[in-house]
């Protein structure tokens, strides 16, 4: 059995790290489409085709279940994939829904009508493509009423993180938080709607202030996956070993990933 984890670059490693800790007995195959990163500035068609190609590569590795550990792909491609493309014997899950369930205090599969929730003012930090898709607002509207969402497209942050430039990433995060607070001075909650952003979570929290609850995805997705596999064990595919694949330069990506997670990670060419 093996589960696939896909991201346009290295951000999905934050999700991989959490799911590996939660499910140590499950092998995971990670696919980073580093050659085409970042996805956040691409159009929806482009993101759809790249995400389908990556998903097929993970199916070929024996992963019947693939997690799109990339909010841009989850937002811009997943709905279309589920409606038009994914065969019956495979599953592809996004990273948005576990986050929204946590925010709206719902259990998985609770399809009751939308209702009032405690949090009324939510700041969303995400890539330009995720913000443009409005997928977060759409999914939230299925579950909650009366929630005001102010979205901030965070241009440049993913690039800075992928390049290992922490000083630039921190400066960009602070400027994006400032820009959002001009439009929504007192958010109650903030969503880090990109799997790269947990690496900058302390900076987001500091810039937003201690009274703002910051939601980041990795642990929420790990719990959701554990729950899913307990209910549907048949989707733990027949792959047997963990591996890391990249469309980029394996040596360069391995070095950045090792820096990223602070443990040795070795990628091979996809």
From Swiss-Prot:
EC number annotated for this UniProt entry: 5.1.1.3
Residues in the signal sequence: none
SUPFAM superfamilies in the cross-refs: Aspartate/glutamate racemase (SSF53681)
GO BP, one annotated term: regulation of cell shape
Gene Ontology terms for molecular function: glutamate racemase activity
Reactions catalysed: L-glutamate = D-glutamate
Classification via Pfam families: Asp_Glu_race
Residues engaged in binding substrate: 7-8, 39-40, 71-72, 195-196
Transmembrane regions: none
Keywords annotated in UniProt: Cell shape, Cell wall biogenesis/degradation, Isomerase, Peptidoglycan synthesis
Active site: 70, 194
Pathway: Cell wall biogenesis; peptidoglycan biosynthesis
Family to which this protein belongs: Belongs to the aspartate/glutamate racemases family.
Function: Provides the (R)-glutamate required for cell wall biosynthesis.
Record protein name field: Glutamate racemase
